[in-house]
Amino acid sequence: MTVGILALQGDFREHEEMLRRIGAPTLQVRLPKHLDRVERLIIPGGESTTIGKLLAMYGLIEPLRARVREGMPIWGTCAGAILMAQRIADGRADQPSLRLMAVTARRNAFGSQLESFEIDLPVEALGGESLRMVFIRAPVLEDLGDDVTPLARLEDGRVVAARQANMLATCFHPELTSDERMHRYFLEM
């Protein structure tokens, strides 16, 4: 099973390294033809507006949507979660996006880069066990659709991880820790 990692911008190398550590073959995805060679895809953190523009420039938006509709598992971390959201609360209407998951993403929900933080929180998908979460200019997920399951919440109740069928979104960066559990969870989806 080859895991594609969108490699247009952002921290795709960290995801690639994590997957290599756990023995999963990877392929950097930059063009639509690369999608034919992967069974699942990770959209990394980075800058959502830039990644969205590059998705459009390289003709990846429609092929990606089609593969996800066919059942390919997809995981967006931070900026990737924003790009997967059907709605972006504070985004521009013309911002290129995948608009796949029935959630609203609120960008930079914690403020600027200076307000970045780490916290340990329980994750439903991991049997309620705690996971170290790194938040860097992170979004939160709001207005979850009926078929979207929240997987992790902050102490104030805001959702920071969710799943809808074959789609996983995390507002934090598991790839920036040494904990492999979220990557293993994605491989089992």
Swiss-Prot record:
Q: Which UniProt keywords apply?
A: Glutamine amidotransferase, Hydrolase, Lyase, Pyridoxal phosphate
Q: What EC number is given for this enzyme?
A: 4.3.3.6, 3.5.1.2
Return the Gene3D superfamilies for the record. 3.40.50.880
* CC per GO annotation: cytosol; glutaminase complex
Q: Which Pfam families match?
A: SNO
**Where is the signal peptide, in residue numbers?**
none
The residues the record assigns to binding L-glutamine are 46-48, 107, 136-137
- Coiled-coil spans are none
Where does the record place the catalytic residues? 78 (nucleophile), 173 (charge relay system), 175 (charge relay system)
Q: Which GO terms describe its biological process?
A: glutamine catabolic process; pyridoxal phosphate biosynthetic process; pyridoxine metabolic process
Q: Which GO terms describe its molecular function?
A: glutaminase activity; pyridoxal 5'-phosphate synthase (glutamine hydrolysing) activity
Copy the pathway line from the protein's UniProt record. Answer: Cofactor biosynthesis; pyridoxal 5'-phosphate biosynthesis
Q: Does the keyword Lyase apply?
A: yes
The protein's superkingdom reads Bacteria
Per the record, what are the reactions this protein catalyses? Answer: aldehydo-D-ribose 5-phosphate + D-glyceraldehyde 3-phosphate + L-glutamine = pyridoxal 5'-phosphate + L-glutamate + phosphate + 3 H2O + H(+); L-glutamine + H2O = L-glutamate + NH4(+)
Q: What does this protein do?
A: Catalyzes the hydrolysis of glutamine to glutamate and ammonia as part of the biosynthesis of pyridoxal 5'-phosphate. The resulting ammonia molecule is channeled to the active site of PdxS.
Quaternary structure, from the entry? In the presence of PdxS, forms a dodecamer of heterodimers. Only shows activity in the heterodimer.
Question: What is stated as this protein's family in its record?
Answer: Belongs to the glutaminase PdxT/SNO family.
PANTHER family according to UniProt: PYRIDOXAL 5'-PHOSPHATE SYNTHASE SUBUNIT SNO, PYRIDOXAL 5'-PHOSPHATE SYNTHASE SUBUNIT SNO1-RELATED
* Name of the molecule in the record: Pyridoxal 5'-phosphate synthase subunit PdxT
Give the species this sequence originates from. Roseiflexus castenholzii (strain DSM 13941 / HLO8)
